[in-house]
Amino acid sequence: LSIISSGGFLPVNRIDYLFDSDISKIFLSFTMILSFFSLFLTYNLIFYNKKKINFLSEDLNLLIYLLVIISFSFVFLNTSNNFPSILVAISSSISNIGISFSDTPSNLIFMFFIMVIIGGSFFSTSSGIRVIKILSLIKFSINNLLSHTKPNQIYSNKVTLINENTEKSDINKYFFSIIIFIISLFILTLLLTLSEINFEQSFKLSILTIMNTVNSSMFELSNFDFYNLSLFTKVYLIIFMIIGRVELLTILILFKKFLFKN
């Protein structure tokens, strides 16, 4: 239940006690990946139709993104022959679950945080900015740069494997959601720093809080003491968890409809 819902709850204090073999770690990785893909993936695969291939386009992009990360990690990062643990950390990061093993390399922390921020599918239990948003913004940015060199040429904002063109209004929403994330990250980091938590821990904890990801050893926050936090600190951590899950952009759109009906 914890894995399906992208939760990080464990029946024991350390996950190492539950999965001690490489096979079990690989199996755990693939089960966590399920929450990275769309909730409708199983349905779309069962009732597959060539006319409805566009419904699988986001998941195909996610699969390519996942395979690139796994291949890169296996070739370049598997220096200590602990790839199963790295695979668990990758699966846990992209699905915003956050659990990891104690032998996960600490020098890969930046990569894990980037994957946590990117997140997974629009229609998944994971959090993050979402892969398609990132791809759409990259495509739009490249087209804008190319339009200055070849102004007479028409450029499409279609993302690879997606038939529909990304509208300018959607691009604006995607960009605005990233701005909101940056502002939220800055505010929460500032609040945590004012609560006498050092800047590094405040910054890491802010990312994980906004992205609804459990802190663990791969983020070097496994020993962070939440119990002794002040009431106000716990309250605004909860508030930013809700903002990260619901997305502040959605809340602003709802308020706009109520406040500016005309």
State each model region's role.
Residues 1-262:
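Membrane-proximal intracellular helices of multi-pass ion channels
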